[in-house]
């Protein structure tokens, strides 16, 4: 078998924007930041919530506003 072909595995802490932290094994690094996790995602919480943190809806409306004029 070949030696040293497997990625390094870290004990990582995943930190959500809501403040929730989870300890997992990861090959990405020791600290991973995410915007949404199971503690705050509407599917897991059962609560309807607006999740546009990156301004995607505003960008879409601005881009296609010229077609709405007609």
UniProtKB/Swiss-Prot annotation:
Gene Ontology molecular-function annotations: metal ion binding; rRNA binding; structural constituent of ribosome
Swiss-Prot/TrEMBL cofactor(s): Zn(2+)
Binding residues for Zn(2+): 16, 18, 37, 40
UniProt entry keywords in alphabetical sequence: Metal-binding, Ribonucleoprotein, Ribosomal protein, RNA-binding, rRNA-binding, Zinc
Xref: InterPro entries: Ribosomal_bL28/bL31-like_sf, Ribosomal_bL31, Ribosomal_bL31_A, Ribosomal_bL31_sf
Cofactor comment text: Binds 1 zinc ion per subunit.
A Pfam family that the UniProt record links to this protein: Ribosomal_L31
Gene Ontology process terms (BP): translation
Keyword Membrane: no
Disulfide bridges in this chain: none
GO cellular component: ribonucleoprotein complex; ribosome
Top-level taxon of origin: Bacteria
HAMAP family xrefs: Ribosomal_bL31_1
Function comment: Binds the 23S rRNA.
Subunit-level organization: Part of the 50S ribosomal subunit.
PANTHER family according to UniProt: 50S RIBOSOMAL PROTEIN L31, CHLOROPLASTIC, LARGE RIBOSOMAL SUBUNIT PROTEIN BL31A
NCBIfam families, per the entry: L31 (TIGR00105), PRK00019.1 (NF000612), PRK00528.1 (NF001809)
Protein family membership: Belongs to the bacterial ribosomal protein bL31 family. Type A subfamily.
Protein name: Large ribosomal subunit protein bL31
Protein source organism: Desulfovibrio desulfuricans (strain ATCC 27774 / DSM 6949 / MB)
Taxonomic classification: Bacteria, Pseudomonadati, Thermodesulfobacteriota, Desulfovibrionia, Desulfovibrionales
